A protein has these predicted regions:
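Internal nucleotide-binding/catalytic subdomain
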Residues: 1-61, 65
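Short, well-ordered beta-strand elements within core beta-sheets of diverse protein domains
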Residues: 2-6, 104, 152-160
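C-terminal catalytic subdomain
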Residues: 73-81, 100-114
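Glycine-rich active-site loop/lid that clamps phosphate-bearing ligands
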Residues: 105-144
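Short, well-ordered alpha-helical segments
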Residues: 160-175
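Short arginine-rich
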Residues: 172-186
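Conserved small/polar residues in nucleotide/adenosyl-binding loops
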Residues: 192-197
């Protein structure tokens, strides 16, 4: 799972990340004459308030994408178009101030060998709040029933003013599911969020 915003990153750490990792990377690309337009996703490890780069991806992360994009108020197509046309500075990107929490449901055994074609019962009975989302990742539908066919299967996302409320919303949905072949982590968002509480 994932959550946003991260309370791990404060202003000081953000400056370190920009000055030690992001800006030098962008300068190096420019010096090499490498024109790049798109996502640059930095996978970081933070040790003693120092950032270390683990990897770069030229795509959004999963489930980071599902967690962050629901907070975006600006039309995503307009952002992509501005990026392609090299005029990102001309558009204003607006975000809402909600807290976002994503819990990923996985097939038993994942990330190793996992069960497939296990029915996920009661999924069609879940009624989402207006600021909550359900993204399918590893499911198929057969005759009105849903079955798991992947490792990461479902993503429940909730936007709220408080992380605790977002967790409560997601837990409400999870309690309705009857899926013997699935599991999820219950500690997402607990470590760095003072307003989050145990289930």
């Amino acid at each position: 799972g994932a959550y946003s915003p991260s309370r791990l990153i404060g202003e000081e750490l953000e400056k370190k990340i920009l000055n030690k990792i992001i800006n030098p990377t962008l300068r190096a690309l420019k010096d090499l004459g490498a024109e790049y337009r798109g996502f640059l996703y930095a996978g970081l490890m933070i040790i003693d308030n120092e950032p270390y780069l683990i990897e770069y991806n030229v795509r959004m992360g999963d489930p980071e994408c599902q967690t962050i994009l629901p907070k975006l108020n600006t039309d995503l197509f307009e952002i992509f178009l501005a990026c392609c046309n090299q005029n990102l500075k001309e558009i204003k990107i607006n975000w809402n101030n909600k807290k976002s929490l994503c819990v990923v449901l996985c097939s038993k055994g994942y990330p190793e060998k996992y069960e497939k074609n296990v029915e996920i019962k009661n999924l069609n009975k879940i009624e989402l709040n207006s600021q909550d989302f359900l993204f399918h990742a590893g499911t198929i539908e057969k005759e009105g029933k849903f079955f798991s066919v992947g490792g990461r299967v479902l993503n429940f996302i909730s936007l709220s003013d408080e992380f605790l409320k977002a967790r409560e919303n997601i837990n409400k949905y999870l309690r309705k599911l009857n899926w013997t072949g699935g599991f999820y982590r219950k500690d997402i968002c607990l470590l760095y969020t003072s307003d989050a509480a145990d289930d």
